[in-house]
Amino acid sequence: MSAEGMKKGTRTPGVTIWLTGLPSAGKSTIAVRLAEVLTAWNMPVELLDGDEIRERLSKGLGFSRQDRDENIRRISYVSRLLTKHGVISIVAAISPYRATRDEARAEIGRFIEVHVNCDLSECVRRDVKGLYKKALAGQITQFTGISDPYEEPLKPEMVLNTHAERLDESVGKVLETLSLMGYVPAHYLNAATTPRPAMSEEMAASTGSGGGTAGAGVSGLVASE
């Protein structure tokens, strides 16, 4: 959609922002903050968090390749419907397999893949639940990044290096991309005066919380990755 169209009040089209990365890379933290900002701008937004969707929409699915793929397909279906109806759908899910993410892209259409990249050592440090420690000790099987593969995106629209960036930097990059692609009016970005919290400590705490909703005005579907 053109900038001229947005100035005339034409509703912006929906889009899916798909945040993928290792456990504790910062996907949920970025998704929550992004949803907060977009909600403050009165943009239609929904947050689909992988951990929460596991509890609601995919409750009964395990962590085999087949079950993981089915879980992502369910998230993709919901996100496609939201996108179709003009909503900015933010997905925060490990979604470890490249082929399944490519399926989601093909199904949804308006799709921005964001690789939330983080050094494995930093992910382990942030993991307040101790899941990495258990996986490294062999107490958890099929754990992404340790005993199960994570296939990095080959050509994502964006890469966020969360071990080196502050939270506001990562979120700002996504907002700028949304503006350049016509999904957010540019004047919103230019006039933004949002708080700028440091990433490292906040990211560590939020990432270990298992996800969550993005605050008032943002509803979170609860699911699993």
Language-model features, listed with the residues they occupy:
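Small-molecule kinase domains that catalyze NTP-dependent phosphoryl transfer to phosphate-bearing small molecules
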Residues: N117, R125-K173, L180-E201
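The conserved Walker
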Residues: P23
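Hydrophobic anchor at the beta1->P-loop junction of P-loop NTPases
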Residues: L19
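ATP-dependent NMP and nucleoside kinases share a basic, alpha-helical "lid"
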Residues: R56-F63, D67, S79-A135, Q142
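Conserved lysine of the Walker
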Residues: K27
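Extreme N-terminal, non-catalytic leader segments
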Residues: M1-T16
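Conserved substrate/cofactor phosphate-moiety recognition/catalytic segment
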Residues: V32-Y77
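Conserved beta-strand scaffold positions in the cores of enzyme catalytic domains, especially
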Residues: L47, F111-H115, E157-V159
